[in-house]
């Protein structure tokens, strides 16, 4: 699957047209036959019709409520209680709800389960509604946002160390002229990419992005798994060009590149989708980067999965190549490192620029440690900016900008003295500064640790606004006066437990225990009864009311003043959106370079060197994931060389299972990825020619969803390699042909080796158990034979994991089966069958010769009788009851001697 989450159709598609009609029908059905729905329910039904196939979070006070089928779905998904509110057609209306203050966690679970959620929030307070339409007025509500997997910005809903891509795909042209356009945006950071490609490259590009959500036209042929179908009208290239120009605020797109019709269609659809999700407002998007596919190593979906580049076979980060390499200390750095490994470069100059920066930090351990220490304290500037632009920001986000930009200035001072100065660092340094005015403003305006919730105030620093300070002073004096009133009331009433409390309904009030309430109930007491509860009675008094009014008014005015300042501060920050985004990107690049330097120093990695010809010369190469796993067990990874050249561009590798063939293949593919991503590599030395495309056919499993067996999956992947690999490609093939009959598999493997050698002419490592393939070395000039070494010692197989020249003498399959725990009778039978097969092949040259000599019923095969065991015989002859102590001691010594002789 290309999308991590699968979703249904979007409003406007044929599927949704059906759901809309159903919603309209349901709306009619929900109306009681004898009476209209209540005003609140009528409002809900109208909003639900607008939300269409999304779950509707309907704000009621401090909760988001869901009704009808939405409630049933949410209660099952969230494991919360399903209750009822009112009736419909004589039946209770299902209802469930979640607290508004903790809604993000529930949203995350719903999104992960594949749902989309429309947020219907209150657009006014109850007090404002009363002013507008009287005491029975219904609070206004509107859908303010549609939450989908690709439109998230909240910290609680995102993985801090992974990008969150929303992708739109569009096509243009027919037949050989057909082209695909892709627009991808991570709105949490504003990153925006546009690319054009041929249809056959679509799967590889989607695999690179690993999108959270994919949007395609409703009539798109063979849509990616989990894609959202959207009306074709949103994918018109002319409208797409207009949307893109409006987004960028330009009259022409000439300054951003020559976009194709397909690219404009995809970009326009992406922008329209984001506008729909934001209910008319757009999130933060940087100017689009036009991605040229040829500038990056092409890696298809099957190869990414088999090499476990960013995710392991289990679908998690742990155990992946990224996990083994990652030493970043910021979320932004981790995201950038993942992007680098997912799209290695093909331009030697750009690769060397990255390696130069890594070399600077690797060579200066003190500088590297100071840099990493400073980066550890950095907030996620990019995502804080994304939330602010999307109008989902908080005072804390402004505080993160303040702290992050201030730290960037200090890093500029630290790194500005570096010598020699790498070109990449020289380009990054100017992006770290220029924010002094904004940082100074935020430092003066905000408290040291601003809160997430702006509703309660308290985030504007004292001294920034004298008028605000005066309002706060009035509120403080009022609260002191209320405390004095509490002491006075206690003295006047003689009730020592009397308290003045505050809540959102009654405001400030006097509370006494019920047993003390009667004297306060009298008309001349000076107190007014407000509420009776179990055990307590609540009152008000004129002077308390007067002080409460003063506190309330000053508090309201203070909150309004803080809100106005918050808007001013946000506007100041958003006025530097592009510059702040550039700083965030520069900080991430520094983190990646320092992290790779740390990894290289930690693991003894080396800088790769690039050659103009198609060599692949790696000395002492290692697999970083396997090496880490082996080291954790206290063992040492066995390094191996891989020396491909124009004269030996295809290595045929044989040897036993578990001998290390697959690891050898994968480690060299991993080295190619790391090198072209701009990273040192786990080897003693490495000289490489640029790899334009990387292919891996290692391991396979049934694809039941698409009706493909393991062998069919293997053949589809092999066919793709033979069709797409060029002379600059690097291919690893493991056990091609093993999923069918021996003769068929051997024939296919033979033909594939010939095709790779004669037609594709690419660098290739081919692992096999078909020893017959070694004959190809006699006529294929650029093919050389190699094997992983193994020995048998005292009947046991010893796997050396070393690569040697020449073919393996045998596969040691039965020895490996013994290691796996097959029973002695089965192993004995296997040896008997193997002897007859090998004897037949030696006599006739036929693989199946000798089968006729085997007994008809294999299960009846006789197992060789075990040799006599002297130790066992000695024990069986002992008469325990007749032994004297001295005889027993002599027998023990004799048994010990027999045991030692048996062990030898």
Swiss-Prot record:
One Pfam family named in its UniProt record: MutS_V
GO CC term, one of those recorded: cytosol
Gene3D superfamilies: 1.10.1420.10, 6.10.140.430, DNA repair protein MutS, domain I, MutS, connector domain, P-loop containing nucleotide triphosphate hydrolases
Top-level taxonomic group: Bacteria
UniProt KW keywords: ATP-binding, DNA damage, DNA repair, DNA-binding, Nucleotide-binding
Residue ranges crossing the lipid bilayer per the database entry: none
Gene Ontology MF term list: ATP binding; ATP-dependent DNA damage sensor activity; damaged DNA binding; mismatched DNA binding
Record-linked InterPro entries: DNA_mismatch_repair_MutS, DNA_mismatch_repair_MutS-lik_N, DNA_mismatch_repair_MutS/MSH, DNA_mismatch_repair_MutS_C, DNA_mismatch_repair_MutS_clamp, DNA_mismatch_repair_MutS_core, DNA_mismatch_repair_MutS_N, DNA_mismatch_repair_MutS_sf
Residues at which ATP binds: 655-662
DNA-binding listed as a keyword: yes
GO terms under biological process: mismatch repair
HAMAP family: MutS (MF_00096)
Family: Belongs to the DNA mismatch repair MutS family.
Annotated function: This protein is involved in the repair of mismatches in DNA. It is possible that it carries out the mismatch recognition step. This protein has a weak ATPase activity.
Name the UniProt record assigns to this protein: DNA mismatch repair protein MutS
Protein source organism: Rhizorhabdus wittichii (strain DSM 6014 / CCUG 31198 / JCM 15750 / NBRC 105917 / EY 4224 / RW1) (Sphingomonas wittichii)
């Amino acid at each position: 699957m290309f999308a991590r989450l699968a979703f249904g159709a979007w409003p406007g598609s044929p599927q949704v047209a059906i759901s809309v009609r159903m919603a309209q029908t349901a709306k009619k059905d929900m109306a009681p036959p004898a009476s209209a729905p209540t005003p609140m329910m009528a409002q809900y039904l109208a909003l639900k019709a607008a939300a269409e196939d999304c779950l509707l979070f309907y704000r009621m006070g401090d909760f988001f409520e869901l009704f009808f089928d939405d409630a049933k779905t949410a209660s099952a998904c969230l494991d919360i209680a399903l209750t009822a509110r009112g009736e419909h057609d004589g039946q209770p209306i299902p209802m469930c709800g979640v607290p508004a203050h903790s809604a993000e966690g529930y949203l995350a679970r719903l999104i992960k389960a594949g749902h989309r959620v429309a947020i219907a929030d209150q657009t006014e307070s109850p007090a404002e509604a009363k002013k507008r339409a009287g005491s029975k007025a219904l609070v206004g509500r509107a859908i303010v946002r549609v939450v989908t997997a690709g439109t998230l910005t909240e910290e609680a809903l995102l993985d801090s160390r992974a990008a969150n891509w929303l992708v739109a795909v569009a096509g243009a042209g027919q037949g050989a002229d057909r082209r695909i356009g892709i627009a991808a945006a991570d709105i949490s950071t504003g990153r925006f990419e546009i690319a054009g490609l041929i249809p056959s490259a679509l799967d590889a590009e989607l695999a690179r992005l690993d999108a959270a959500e994919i949007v395609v036209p409703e009539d798109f042929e063979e849509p990616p798994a989990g894609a959202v179908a959207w009306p074709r009208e949103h994918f018109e290239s002319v409208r797409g060009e207009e949307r893109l120009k409006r987004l960028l605020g330009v009259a022409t797109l000439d300054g951003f590149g020559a976009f194709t019709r397909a690219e404009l269609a995809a970009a326009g659809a992406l922008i329209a989708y984001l506008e729909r999700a934001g209910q008319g407002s757009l999130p933060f998007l940087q100017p689009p980067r036009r991605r040229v596919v040829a500038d990056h190593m092409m890696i298809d979906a099957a190869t990414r999965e088999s090499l476990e580049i960013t995710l392991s076979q289990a679908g998690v980060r742990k155990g992946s190549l990224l996990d083994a390499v990652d030493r970043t200390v910021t979320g932004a750095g981790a995201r950038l490192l993942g992007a680098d490994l997912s799209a290695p470069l093909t331009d030697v100059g750009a690769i060397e620029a990255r390696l130069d920066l890594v070399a600077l930090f690797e060579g200066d351990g003190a500088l590297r440690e100071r840099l990493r220490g400073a980066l550890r304290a950095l907030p996620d500037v990019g995502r804080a900016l994304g939330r602010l632009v999307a109008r989902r920001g908080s005072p804390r986000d402004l505080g993160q900008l303040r702290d992050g930009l201030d730290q960037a200035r200090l890093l500029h001072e630290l790194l500005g003295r570096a010598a020699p100065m790498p070109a990449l660092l020289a380009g990054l340094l100017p992006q770290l500064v220029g924010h002094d005015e904004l940082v100074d403003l935020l430092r003066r305006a905000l408290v040291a640790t601003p809160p997430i919730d702006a509703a309660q105030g308290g985030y504007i620093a004292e001294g920034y606004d004298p008028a605000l300070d005066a309002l706060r002073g009035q509120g403080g004096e009022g609260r002191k006066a209320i405390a004095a009133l509490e002491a006075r009331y206690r003295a006047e009433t003689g009730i020592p437990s009397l308290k003045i409390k505050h809540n959102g309904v009654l405001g400030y009030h006097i509370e006494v225990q019920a047993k003390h309430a009667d004297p306060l109930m009298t008309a001349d007491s000076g107190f007014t009864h407000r509420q009776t509860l179990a055990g307590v009675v609540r009152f008000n008094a004129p002077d308390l009311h007067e002080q409460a009014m003063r506190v309330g008014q000053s508090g309201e005015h203070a909150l309004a003043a803080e809100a106005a300042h918050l808007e001013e501060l946000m506007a100041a920050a958003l006025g530097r959106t592009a510059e702040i985004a550039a700083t965030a990107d520069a900080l991430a690049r520094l983190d990646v370079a320092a992290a790779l330097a740390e990894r290289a120093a930690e693991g003894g990695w080396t800088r790769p060197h690039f050659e103009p010809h198609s060599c692949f010369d790696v000395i002492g190469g290692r697999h970083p994931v396997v090496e880490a796993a082996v080291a954790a067990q206290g063992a040492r990874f066995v390094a191996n060389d891989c020396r491909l050249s124009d004269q030996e561009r295809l290595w045929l590798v044989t040897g036993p299972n578990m001998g290390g063939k697959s690891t050898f293949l994968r480690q060299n593919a991993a080295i190619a990825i790391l090198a072209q991503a701009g990273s040192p590599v786990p080897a003693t030395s490495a000289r490489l020619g640029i790899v334009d495309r990387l292919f891996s056919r290692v391991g396979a499993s049934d694809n039941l969803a698409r009706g493909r067996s393991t062998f069919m999956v293997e053949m589809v992947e092999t066919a793709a390699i033979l069709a797409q690999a060029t002379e600059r490609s690097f291919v690893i093939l493991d056990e091609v042909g093993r999923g069918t009959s021996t003769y068929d598999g051997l024939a296919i493997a033979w033909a594939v080796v010939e095709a790779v050698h004669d037609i594709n002419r690419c660098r290739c490592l081919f692992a096999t158990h078909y020893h017959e393939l070694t004959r190809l070395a006699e006529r294929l000039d650029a093919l050389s034979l190699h094997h992983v070494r193994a020995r048998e010692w005292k009947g046991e197989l010893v796997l050396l994991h070393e690569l040697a020249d020449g073919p393996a003498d045998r596969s040691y399959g039965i020895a490996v089966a013994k290691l796996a725990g097959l029973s002695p009778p089965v192993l004995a039978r296997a040896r008997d069958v193997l002897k007859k097969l090998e004897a037949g092949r030696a006599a006739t040259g036929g693989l199946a010769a000798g089968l006729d000599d085997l007994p008809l019923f294999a299960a009846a095969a006789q197992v060789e009788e075990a040799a006599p065991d002297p130790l066992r015989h000695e024990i069986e002859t002992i008469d325990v009851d007749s032994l004297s102590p001295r005889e027993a001691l002599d027998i023990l010594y004799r048994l010990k001697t027999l045991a030692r002789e048996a062990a030898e």
